[in-house]
Amino acid sequence: MITLIEIKKSLDEILSKIDGDKKYINEVAKKITPITYKLLYINETKCIRCNLCYKECPVDAIEKAKVKKSAKIIEDKCVKCEICAQTCPVGAIYVIEGRAEIEDSEVHYTIKEKSIPHRKIRLKKYELDENTCIKCGICARFCPTNAIKAVRRKSIEVNLDLCMGCGACAEVCPKKCIKVERELGEVIKTRDIEVDKNLCVGCLVCIEECPINAIDQDGDKVKINKDKCILCGRCVDVCPTNAIKMWEKK
């Protein structure tokens, strides 16, 4: 976790600017629980147009990249599962976490960039139809490993020893004369999740809210299919009895 911003400010200083009963406001303020949020965004200058994030997003929350436009996260559809960040072969997707809390009569506000593990990616097969290729060089422009060397309108060379198999070249090729087959590793489970059956009241709100239908009714309780779960935390947020817990693995 990399700290980007850290602010500490006296609670008394903040409350002094608020009208009303200072003693009452101070007591209420100290009972406020920490507020957290998470934001994912794509660095447009680093995006290589491979569209792996678009293809791997389980809730279709990413707009497909085009030659002149990077991929884009659709905020109101994103469930913050971090799969896109794990999948991006060049680390162009950032996960930012913010937290505000009152501690020792101070308001603490921090913004951090979360360290994300990356799925393995490996080239399996590469095909270039040289008869169709117009040697425009767009593929070379977006190749993140400089595996493609092109002389505009004259020649193109691909060094497969350098190719990682991201498929950016195939995505941007105007003639669709490149085919790439890759091996993509499993999503890395950085968190775990459990249902406390003693707290679960069987309201089934979590089942209704799960974006990928990974929760099933289990008698008068619920159970989570961990193989299917994307660990987005939506069920944790909506559970009225705090029966679902999710935590970071060490």
From Swiss-Prot:
Q: Which Pfam families match?
A: Fer4, Fer4_21
PANTHER family from the xrefs? ADENYLYLSULFATE REDUCTASE, BETA SUBUNIT (PTHR43687), FERREDOXIN III (PTHR43687:SF1)
Which GO MF term does the entry hold, naming one? 4 iron, 4 sulfur cluster binding
Give the top-rank taxon of the lineage listed in the UniProt record for this protein.
Answer: Archaea
Q: Which UniProt keywords apply?
A: 4Fe-4S, Electron transport, Iron, Iron-sulfur, Metal-binding, Repeat, Transport
Please state every residue range assigned to the domain named 4Fe-4S ferredoxin-type: 38-67, 69-98, 124-153, 154-183, 191-220, 220-249
Organism of derivation: Methanocaldococcus jannaschii (strain ATCC 43067 / DSM 2661 / JAL-1 / JCM 10045 / NBRC 100440)
- Entry annotated with the keyword Metal-binding: yes
Q: Which residues form a coiled coil?
A: none
Q: Where does [4Fe-4S] cluster bind?
A: 47, 50, 53, 57, 78, 81, 84, 88, 133, 136, 139, 143, 163, 166, 169, 173, 200, 203, 206, 210, 229, 232, 235, 239
Full protein name? Uncharacterized polyferredoxin-like protein MJ0514
